[in-house]
């Protein structure tokens, strides 16, 4: 109960309170957080990440005292945006089938978001570049969703804005989220569906792995990303993520310790080799899906 901790500090004459989180909800280090106090306090209260709290403690231990400068701001009525680019086939009628390549471009407070999810957004941009001159009879949509971290708001809004006719046009969604970590225990590139069932997208990913002689590509069950709203309305979709799974029932898995923390930066948490592998697997899966006849893809989706 943070309220009690803050009240105790106030009673002892504290001018401010720095709380810090030891561990996150997924085995990661504690992240910067909102203390969400239910009682109004007369002093400033901040929620620090584990790394920030430790650094502050070390500074105090060395010097006995230190000066910490913090800025607080209140924001309301914020707007989130989805960034959407479409590559239409020549002589488009507007009714062609479509393949979606997606990611989210937001991070959480206090985290640079190199792997979560600049890696996914970078992948979408690179595949947009790679496919710019590829002729197909299908539309390709490259989408960067906003506000994934606050509850899949961007993708949920997008899916809810589609008519049933528009939903039926989408053959599959390749959603990249955390595709470049260097964490050794996150040893496989998974194509995840919310219910664990295979679909057109996971089939394409596994086939791509075979074509590339890559045995690190596996299928699994996981939600918590922008593939979920699509799956909920029957559109084949999968999350691509580096993860290690020890057990599915109960679910015991590994993602990087620096997930959602200040250490999720390019220097500490990015593997160019894994990024390249994700690009190759997802790019090959997308290409193969685009090359299939509409009849083939509809049969796989059924």
Predicted regions span which residues?
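Metal-dependent peptidase/peptidase-like ectodomains
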Residues: 135-136, 145-244, 248-249
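Solvent-exposed loop/turn segments at secondary-structure junctions
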Residues: 22-27, 51-53, 75-77, 91, ...
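Structural recognition of the beta-strand scaffold that forms the well-ordered cores
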Residues: 16-20, 45-48, 83-86, 98-102, ...
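Extracellular/luminal Protease-associated
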Residues: 1-44, 216
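Second-shell loop/turn segments in exported
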Residues: 1-6, 41-46, 71-73, 107-117, ...
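Soluble metallo-hydrolase cores and metallopeptidase-like ectodomains found primarily
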Residues: 34-114, 129, 133, 137-139
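Active-site alpha-helical elements of protease catalytic centers
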Residues: 8, 12, 114-127
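His/Asp/Glu-rich mid-to-C-terminal helical/loop segments that flank catalytic regions of hydrolases
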Residues: 249-302
């Amino acid at each position: 109960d943070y309220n009690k901790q803050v009240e105790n500090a106030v009673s002892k004459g504290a001018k401010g309170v720095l709380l810090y989180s030891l561990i996150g909800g997924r085995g990661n280090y504690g992240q910067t957080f909102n203390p969400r106090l239910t009682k109004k306090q007369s002093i400033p209260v901040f929620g620090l990440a584990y790394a920030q709290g430790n650094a502050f403690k070390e500074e105090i231990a060395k010097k006995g005292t230190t000066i910490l400068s913090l800025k607080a701001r209140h924001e309301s009525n914020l707007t989130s945006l989805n960034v959407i680019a479409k590559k239409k086939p020549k002589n488009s009628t507007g009714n062609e089938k479509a393949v979606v390549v997606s990611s989210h471009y937001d991070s959480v407070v206090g985290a640079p978001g190199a792997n979560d999810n600049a890696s996914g957004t970078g992948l979408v941009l690179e595949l947009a570049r790679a496919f710019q001159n590829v002729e197909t009879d299908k539309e390709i949509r490259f989408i960067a969703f906003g506000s994934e971290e606050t509850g899949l708001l961007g993708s949920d809004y997008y899916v809810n804005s589609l008519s049933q006719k528009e939903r039926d046009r989408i053959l599959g969604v390749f959603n990249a989220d955390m595709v470049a970590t260097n964490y050794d225990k996150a040893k496989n590139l998974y194509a995840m569906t919310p219910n664990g069932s295979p679909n057109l997208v996971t089939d394409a990913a596994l086939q791509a792995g075979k074509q590339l002689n890559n045995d690190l590509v596996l299928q699994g069950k996981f939600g918590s990303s922008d593939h979920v709203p699509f799956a909920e309305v029957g559109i084949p979709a999968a999350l691509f993520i580096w993860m290690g799974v020890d057990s599915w029932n109960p679910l015991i898995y590994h993602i990087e310790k620096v997930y959602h923390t200040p250490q999720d930066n390019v220097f500490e948490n990015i593997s160019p080799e894994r990024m390249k592998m994700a690009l190759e697997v997802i790019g090959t899966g997308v290409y193969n899906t685009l090359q299939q006849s509409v009849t083939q893809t509809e049969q796989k989706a059924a």
